[in-house]
Amino acid sequence: MDKYEQLNNLLEINSIIAVKGVAAIFNGNMQIRNPVINVFKENINYSDFVPEYDIPKNLINYFNETINNLEDKYKKIAIAATGAMGYDEKRWNQFITCVAAEKFHGNKRGGLFLHTVGVMKTIENIIVDYIINPFYMSAKDSINKDRLMLKAIVHDIMKIKEYDYEGIIRRKSIKMDHLVMGASYINEINNEVGKVLDEEELDDICYSILSHHGEFGNFEPKTIEDVLLNAADIIDSQIVNAIENKI
C-alpha cells in the first residue's frame, strides 16, 4: 500500500489534521518534507475552522419576542420547531448554526438564522403597513398575521437536514429538499405539541412552505400568504446576495 492509499484510508472529508515537517520551496512551490500527519476526531469546535456569522444578541431577543407575541397555537409550533427558549437545545443549536445556502446567500454558519430573521422583518413591515396601521386599506380579513409570521419562522427550517455545515459547506446527496422535508416536519411538530393546528390550517402552513420558492419550485403559490412568503424570501436572499457578492 503506497502513501496515497494510506492517506485515503486515514482521512475523511472534513477531517481536521495537524501537519508537522520541514517547509521548503521547490520549483517555486511550498512543500513539506518528512510530514507527520495527526488526525483529530474528538472535541472539535468547527467554528474555529468554518466561516461563521457573528449573530448579535439583539436579533436572538427579537426572534424570541416575536414568537412570544404570537397566538398560542402558533407560538407552540414555532418554539418546538426551532427549539427556541430552552425547548430543545439540540434543535436550537442546529437552527442557529446552519447555513442558508451553499453558495448564493448566507453561506456561512448562522446564515439560516439571519435569513429567517430577514424574512420575519420583511413580513413584519407588511403586517404593520397593511394590518396593524394600514396606510389606506386593511388586509386583516385577508391575512392571518400570526400565521404568516409563523410561516416566516419555519419556512426554511429543514435546511438543517439538507446541508452539511460542519466543515465543507455543501448540500447532502439526498432526494428530498428542505421544502418537502419542512412540510413533513411541521406535521410532526404539530403532533408533538398536541395537534394544536386542525387539518385545514396545517395543510395551509405546509403548502406555504412547499410553495415559497415560487416559480423556481415545484409548487405554485396560491393564497396571498403563499405569495407574501415567497416575496419576503426573495427580498432578503437577493439583498444579502447583493451585499455579500457585490452585485
Regions found by a protein language model. Give the residues of each.
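Acidic/His-rich, divalent-metal-binding segments that scaffold phosphate/diphosphate chemistry
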Residues: 48-172
